[in-house]
Amino acid sequence: MHNKTLHLALAITLGSGISPMLFAAVANDANPEPAATQNSHFDSKGKAPSSYTIEAQNAVRKTLPFADNRDFEEARKGFIAAPSYNKIMAEAGNVAWNMGSYDFLLGGKDYDSINPSLQRQAVLNMAFGLYEVVPEKIYQVRGFDLANITFIKGDTGWIVFDTLMSKETAKAALDFINEKLGKRPVVAIVISHSHADHFGGVRGLVDEADVRSGKIPLIAPTGFMEHAVAENVYAGNAMTRRAFFQYGVMLPHSPYGHVDMAIGKNASLGNMGLIEPNRYIEKDFESLTIDGVEMEFQSTPGTEAPAEMNTWFPQFKAFWAAENIVGTIHNIYTLRGALVRDPLVWSKNINNALYRYGQQADVMFASHSWPRWGNERIQDVMRAQRDAYANLNNAVLHAANQGVTINEIQNVYKLPESLKNNWATHSYHGSEEHNSRAVINRYLGYWDANPATLMPLSPKDSAPLYMEMMGGADKIMVKGKSLFDQGKYREAYEILNKLVYAEPQNTQAKDLLADVYEQVGYQKESAGVRNSFLAAAYELRHGMPKGVPPKPTGPDMIRAMSTELWLEYLGIALDGSKVADQHLVLNLRTPDNGEQFVVELSNSTLTTIKGQQAKKADLTITLDRSDLEGVMARKTSFAQLVAAGKATFEGDHKPFERLMAAITPFTPTFELLPGTQQ
C-alpha cells in the first residue's frame, strides 16, 4: 500500500451516512490493496482471529436466525440481468467503481475475521444489476454505487429516484437499463434527501439547461439545497479526517479489512455534481402526477437527513421509503461526526407511513438495500424498525432518568430480545453502543455530572501520570499482553491507550494496541465500528496515510454554498492570534444577486450579518457573486479580480490583506492517534 500513489481529493463535507467525495482517498483503483490472497492477511503485522474471537463469532452463528432466508429471496427477486463488467471508469481516468473487489464474499466461506451477522449483510449488499420491483413499471439498478438508482416507467420516459453519487455510475446505470429494456429519455428526477450518494450523479442523467428551463422537473424536499452543502461545512475538515476511520478508506477489500458499508458496498470515486431543483415539496403531504405516474410525497425532516421525503405510488400500491427504512438500523450519531439525529422523530415518521401507506402497500422499496414484498412482510419490517428507534430513545432515557450516564449507557442498553431475532433491526450502520450514547448526548450533553470529567486533563497530559502509577511501560506491556492473551480486549486497550499517549514513539506498545483493536474490529457487527477499529490498527502500525495536497471544491458545490455560509466558514478558518490587535469593518456587496453583508473583525473574531451595510466601513468590496465563486474555490484572488476590473475596493485594503493572510487552509492531515504522524 505504501508504494502506491495516494490521491487525496478534498471537497466540502456534504453530510450523509457517508462522507461523500469530501475525502476520496484511493490508490490506482477503488481498492487500495488487491484482495487476491484472501486466506492471508494483507498486512505483514496483521493477526488472524484469536480463539476468543472465533468463539465470539461461533456464538453469533448459534444465536441469530440464519435459517431465515427471506432477505436473500427478496434481494434476488426480480433480477433481470447483470452487466458484463464490474468496473466503472471515472472521467479522470481512475476506477470510479469496482464491484469485483468484493468477490471474495461470494465464495460461501464463513470468515472468522468478520462478524457473521455483518458478513450476511455484506453478501446481501452484493446485488449487482437490473431488478424489476413492480412488473413493467418500477425498476432498480443495484450495486453500481453505494445507493440504488430507481427508474419509474412513465408514459414517455423514465422518472428517476435518486441519482447515485457520481456522474459516471449514474450514466452507466441509465445506459444499462436502456440497453436491457429499450431506450427511454429521463423525463423527471426526484431526489429523496440531501446526501450526496443520492444527488451527486445528476449530471450523468440530464443536462442542467433542461432543468433550468423547466423541461425536466427536478424535485426535492424543501431545505434540500441548504442542507446538501451546509450540514457539515463548519467541521468539514475534522469530519473528513475522521471519515478515514468510519469508512475504512485505507483498508483493502478483504476478510481482514473492508467488507461493507452497511447500506451498500462503498462510495464511488467519480465526478460528483449538484443541480438546483426546480420544484420543492413543502407540505407534509403533497401529490403530483408526472408522465402519468401518481405520487404522494411524505415529508420526513429530521430523520435520516435534515431534508428527506418518502413517496407513495397509489397506482402500484408501492411505498418508497427513501433512506428511512432500509436493511439496517441507521446511525443516530455518525462516527465521522455530525449533529445527533432524533430516533423518536424517526420512529414517528415510520409510524405515520405505516398507518398511511403500509397497511395497503404491496411492495416497499428504498434508496438502499432490497425491496420487501407482501403486506404482512412490509408491516412487520416497518413496525420492527419503528419500535427499534423508539426503544432506543425511550429505554436510554429510562436509564438516564435513573442515573445511568453517557459513560455507562453503552454497557447498559440492549435491544429487546424480540427485536434481535428480526434481521431488519440489526445495527450495521449504527451500533447499540454509540447510538445509545448519542441519545444521552442529545438530551443531556456530554457531561456525566461528575466534576472530575467536566474539565479533565488532555489524554497526553494524564497518560504519564497513569503510567507512573502503574509502574512504567514494561509493567503496562506485560499486563496488556496478559489481557490480550485472555481475550479481555476492552480492558487491554484501556491501559495500552494510556501507554501510547505517554510514549507515542513506543512501537511495541502501538503494535500491541493495534493487535487489540484488530480483534475488536473482527468481532463487531457494525461496519462503521469495525472499520474504525481496523483503520486505527493500521495507522498504529504504519502511520497516517500520505498524499498530494487536497484538490479544490467542485464548481457545483461552490455555487450551492451561500455567501453567508462561506463568510461564516472564514470565521472558523481565521487564526485569531494573528490578528489579535486588529479591528476591521468591511462592507461586501454582490450586485448580481442583490446581497450585501457587514463583516467585522474584532477581539480576534470574525462576525457576519446579512442584509446590512455599515455607515463607516473601513473597506467596501463590490463584486458579482459569480466572480466571488472563484475566490471561494481558491481559483483566483480578490487582488486578481480587482486587476481584471471585476471587483472594486473602496477604502484601506491593507487590514483586509492581513485578515486574509490569517485564514488557515485546513487539510485533513492531523493525527487521530498519537505517534502516527509520519
Q: What is each model feature region?
A:
Residues 482, 488-494, 498-501, 505-507, ...:
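Feature captures hydrophobic
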Residues 156-157, 167-219:
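Active-site metal-binding motif and surrounding structural segment of the metallo-beta-lactamase
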Residues 463-495:
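Alpha-helical segment of the N-proximal tetratricopeptide repeat
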Residues 34-57, 318, 328, 344-408, ...:
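Divalent-metal (often Zn2+) His-rich catalytic cores of metallo-beta-lactamase-fold enzymes
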Residues 123-184, 309-313, 317-323:
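Conserved beta-strand hairpin/beta-sheet module of binuclear metal-dependent hydrolase folds
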Residues 1-27:
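Gram-negative bacterial Sec-dependent N-terminal signal peptides
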Residues 133, 157-158, 165-167, 182, 219, 225-300, ...:
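Metallo-beta-lactamase
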